[in-house]
């Protein structure tokens, strides 16, 4: 089963996270299928970058979001629809 969750990067006491698609039973920082975003909690407010279309793709394929990623997903504004 695939999960969309955080993978920790950065130095000690300076966390920076990648938002990754990964097998559920792999280690937190193990080999991921795809990196779909980043999260830096050290900025005020925390900076979040997400590839929304890729996250939606993986969710449509059955990937589950972790609780924290779900909260970050809700915080990020949806891209405005292009006016044709």
Curated annotation (Swiss-Prot):
Similarity section: Belongs to the bacterial ribosomal protein bS16 family.
Pfam assignment, any one: Ribosomal_S16
Name under which the protein is recorded: Small ribosomal subunit protein bS16
One GO MF term attached to the UniProt entry: structural constituent of ribosome
Encoding gene per record: rpsP
InterPro entries: Ribosomal_bS16, Ribosomal_bS16_CS, Ribosomal_bS16_dom_sf
GO BP: translation
HAMAP family per the UniProt record, alphabetical: Ribosomal_bS16
Cellular component, GO, one term: small ribosomal subunit
Domain of life: Bacteria
Keywords from the named record: Ribonucleoprotein, Ribosomal protein
